[in-house]
């Protein structure tokens, strides 16, 4: 078995969504003073590689803590979208090119290659986004969730969060700021693998950091 980490490390200087504060990692206990080390973490619920709950957008829809654990694991498939440039939409035909695998997967992950810009101002630029027709495919095929190696399912300029509204209305989850999709795509040979994206469980969770992993059977 091979496990590939798809998670960005949380640091104080990491990229965060425009308008939010970065995380704070402060020593709460030290070896010298307390005989152990403990850290006080202060951060927004949508920090780093994280998951959006339906309740992120819709009042009364499920929070992450209310969802069954099997909502966060299943068959994953990576769609290679690296040919799409800045501001381009990823069309439905790109998903159709994966054939039956796209139907069978519980989660579709979209590899744009944008994670190479993590830590640079360009990361917040005009990244490729899914077309609304592609988002509708996720709904029509009953996906558990969608994941991307960019900061949002929507363009940053879309203050209405059109795609978030479209997808989260159907109680899917969205995983943003993934990394390592290139390695996972090569390891999976473009096929299905086991995906685990387990969010922190706290009360009324509208979103949470996750530890995302692609698990390959060798």
List where the protein language model places each region:
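Active-/binding-site microenvironments in catalytic and ligand-binding cores
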Residues: 1-218
């Amino acid at each position: 078995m091979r496990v590939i980490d798809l998670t960005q490390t949380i640091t104080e200087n990491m990229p965060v969504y425009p308008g939010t504060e970065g995380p704070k990692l402060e020593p709460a206990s030290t070896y010298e003073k307390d005989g152990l080390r403990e850290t006080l973490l202060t951060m927004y619920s949508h920090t780093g590689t994280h998951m959006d709950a339906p309740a992120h957008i819709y009042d009364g829809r499920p929070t992450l803590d209310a969802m069954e654990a099997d909502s966060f694991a299943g068959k994953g498939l990576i769609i290679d979208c690296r040919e799409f440039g800045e501001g381009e939409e990823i069309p439905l035909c790109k998903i159709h090119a994966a054939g039956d695998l796209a139907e069978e997967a519980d989660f579709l992950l979209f590899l744009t290659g944008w994670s190479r810009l993590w830590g640079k101002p360009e990361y917040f630029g005009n990244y490729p986004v899914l077309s609304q027709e592609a988002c509708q495919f996720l709904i029509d095929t009953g996906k558990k969730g969608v994941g991307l190696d960019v900061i949002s399912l929507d363009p940053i300029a879309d203050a209405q969060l059109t795609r978030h509204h479209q997808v989260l209305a159907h109680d899917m989850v969205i995983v943003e700021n993934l990394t390592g999709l290139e390695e996972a795509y090569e390891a999976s040979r473009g096929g299905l693998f086991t995906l685990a994206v387990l969010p922190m469980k706290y009360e009324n969770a509208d979103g949470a950091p996750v530890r995302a992993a692609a698990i390959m059977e060798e």
